[in-house]
From Swiss-Prot:
The UniProt record lists the keyword Repressor: no
This protein's record includes keyword Nucleus: yes
Region (Disordered): 511-536, 595-631
Organism: Saccharomyces cerevisiae (strain ATCC 204508 / S288c)
Name of protein: DnaJ-like chaperone JEM1
Quaternary data: Interacts with MPS3.
Pfam assignment, any one: DnaJ
Keywords tagged on the record: Chaperone, Endoplasmic reticulum, Membrane, Nucleus, Signal, Transmembrane, Transmembrane helix
Compositional bias ranges of the Basic and acidic residues kind: 597-606
Length: 645
């Protein structure tokens, strides 16, 4: 074994110098062959870098004036250019600048790749604000100088409108770290006035640009601070997922205290809250809602628990008067946002921020961040889903609060008009609110339907009901597994049925009024006629009741028949003629008018039992023995009267 090992060592010691010597040889043809077989992609980058290293170490040491040197430099420039393109595609712009500069700074031989690299470099110099390296300073440069002067003047005079000028400057030089940091500073100053989603999103975008384009030039502390700031704004202002930046922060330094505390806080809240899909995704809300059953626990956690969910000293670095976890969370959010405002990495605090009161910055909008509105929405949904009446009542006020801060002013006005005046909503309102927060739309619908119960029926009201009903049908909500959705659907159907019954009653009243007007008109034209009952007409049969039916049974039968032969049925039933249905309706009304009146009903019953009793068209015949409807004397022409004369 020792002999074999010794032999191998002897052979290796002989071959190694040969390998080292071979590696120092410039095999240009082999390097050119390798270059042709490679794609311009990230996977090929290490191979391009190896070829570039071979060229630099073994091939570019010869006399620059030698004949073979031009081929070496041409290959090197091609390799550098491809490396630069791959670096650009990976957002490594500063590295790409260094790579392209290797081509341009070689004065001996540039070739076509030298021109391409020069063009790329000039564009990158402008993007990064390296104006001292730009060859042709055109109108764009003049505008850059003008904007710079305007920005300096506005900053010195504390004019916050400078944000518009900085934004315009970033359109010229989007990756200039000095311009980006100035923009961040102005945005933070505005955020101290009002916690606004668009401002927070703009700050995050600027910091992400700096991380993407200037990562290599940033210190570890700066990178940690940036990831922390982005995480706070994403979580508690934008209500978006910050897990990527928290992981980045802790991967750089797992003991970084701010990111550790933030991660712990978010983790504890996520254990209580339902998933965002269950709250914000319409399909999950409507058809998978039964998967979450801890609605009572949510109300308990935020509004009833007597202990904070995390030790105040851990997250706030101070004690606080604890009322419940909802108000405690408000304090945490204020503290965290204040912290990122004060730290604002890379920014210089060029403006004087609003005064701090009671340890916190001015704006009341701390209470209206997207995250807190989201928590309000969770509590609202919990109030609708909880079987415990007391808990539900405790959480109910958060519905109106969440809705007020979720809707735009215009949409809020439309919602109020729908509630108070039953005005139909604009076409997009129902779908827009549904797609952003489905439970809030169901709360809106419930409020509108309950409010409209006491309102008079109108065409507007019918249009509003039809609009809501169409939305339910279009989205398949009649099949929802969410009990609150189904509660609203049943309430809507009940309201629609009430409206239909009201419409039927109105029609019948109008019909009776017309009949009464006609009768009054006839009475004015001719002497009133005595009741005329045709025993051939069976009013009981027409109404479908027995002769012993009560008044209540007669009325019920009548209402059912009026629904059946309502004018709306005329259009729906193509087999019956319009005149026939009107005739049927006339008989129904005639029968009901007689049988619903006790006196008329008695008279009708008597006429049916004694048909001859009702044979006189003008009422009962008067007992006048001297009146003969025929010709002559009523006792016959041969009858002789004897008056005792």
């Amino acid at each position: 074994m020792i002999l074999i090992s010794g032999y191998c060592l002897l052979v290796y010691s002989v071959i190694l110098p040969v390998l080292i010597s071979a590696s120092k040889l410039c095999d240009l043809a082999e390097l050119q062959r390798l270059n042709k077989n490679l794609k311009v992609d990230t996977e090929s980058l290490p191979k391009y870098q190896w070829i570039a290293g071979q060229l630099e170490q073994n091939c570019m040491t010869a006399d620059p004036a030698s004949e073979n040197m031009s081929d070496v430099i041409q290959l090197a420039n091609q390799i550098y250019y491809k490396i630069g393109l791959i670096q650009l595609s990976n957002d490594q712009h500063l590295r790409a600048i260094n790579t392209f500069e290797k081509i341009v700074f070689n004065e001996t031989y540039k070739g076509s790749f030298g021109k391409l690299a020069e063009k790329r470099l000039q564009e990158l110099y402008v993007d990064f604000g390296m104006w001292d390296k730009v060859h042709q300073k055109d109108d764009q440069y003049a505008k850059y100088l003008s904007l710079n002067e305007t920005i300096r003047n506005k900053i010195s005079s504390k004019d916050v409108s400078v944000e518009e000028d900085i934004s315009e400057l970033l359109r010229i030089t989007p990756y200039d770290v000095n311009v980006l940091s100035t923009h961040i500073d102005v945005l933070f100053h505005k955020l101290a006035e009002e916690i606004d989603v668009s401002l927070a999103a703009a700050i995050i975008l600027d910091y992400e640009t700096i991380l993407d384009k200037h990562l290599a030039s940033l210190s570890i502390d700066t990178r940690l601070s940036i990831h922390y700031v982005i995480s706070v704004l994403q979580t508690f202002v934008l209500n978006s997922d910050a897990s990527f930046n928290i992981r980045k922060c802790l991967s750089i330094d797992m003991d970084y205290d701010k990111c550790k505390k933030l991660s712990l806080t978010i983790s504890k809240l996520n254990k209580v809250n339902p998933s965002k899909r269950q709250i914000l995704d319409p399909a999950t809300y409507a058809f998978e809602n039964k998967k979450f059953r801890s609605w009572d626990r949510i109300i308990e956690f935020y509004l009833k628990d007597k202990k904070p969910f995390i030790t105040p000293m851990k997250i706030l670095n101070k004690d606080t008067n604890f009322k419940n976890n909802y108000f405690f969370l408000e304090e945490i959010i204020k503290q965290l946002i204040e912290d990122v405002q004060l730290s604002r990495p890379l920014a210089k605090n060029l403006f004087e921020d609003p005064p701090i009161t009671d340890g916190f910055v001015k704006p009341k909008s701390y209470y209206h961040t997207d995250y807190l509105v989201y928590i309000d929405s969770i509590l609202c949904q919990a109030s609708s889903m909880s079987p415990d009446v007391k808990r539900a009542k405790l959480a109910a006020p958060f519905c109106k609060k969440s809705l007020r801060h979720s809707l735009t002013l215009e949409t809020w006005k439309h919602y109020q008009d729908a509630k108070s005046e039953q005005k139909p909503l604009p076409e997009t309102v129902l779908s827009d609110v549904w797609n952003s927060n489905p439970h809030l739309l169901m709360y809106m619908v419930n409020s509108i339907l309950n409010k409209s119960r006491s309102k008079p029926h109108s065409q507007f009201k019918k249009q509003l009901y039809d609009q809501i009903n169409k939305f339910f049908q279009d989205n398949g909500l009649s099949e929802s597994t969410n009990p609150y959705v189904m509660k609203n659907f049943r309430l809507l159907q009940k309201q629609l049925q009430t409206y239909k019954e009201h419409k039927h009653r109105n029609f019948n009243q109008q019909y009776f009024q017309q009949q009464q007007q006609q009768q009054q008109h006839q009475r004015h034209q001719a002497p009133p006629a005595a009741p005329n009952y045709d025993p051939k007409k069976d009013y009981y049969k027409i109404l479908g009741v027995s002769p012993s039916a009560s008044s209540k049974e007669i009325r019920k039968a009548y209402l059912n028949l009026t629904k059946k032969y309502h004018p709306d049925k005329i259009k729906a039933n193509h087999n019956d003629k319009q005149e026939s249905i009107h005739e049927t309706m006339s008989q129904i009304n005639e029968a009901y008018e007689t049988l619903s009146d006790d006196d008329k009903r008695k008279e009708y019953d008597l006429s049916r039992s004694n048909p001859r009793r009702n044979t006189f068209p003008q009422g009962p015949r008067q007992n006048n023995m001297f009146k003969n409807p025929g010709s002559g004397f009523p006792f016959g022409n041969g009858f002789k009267m004897n008056f005792g004369l």
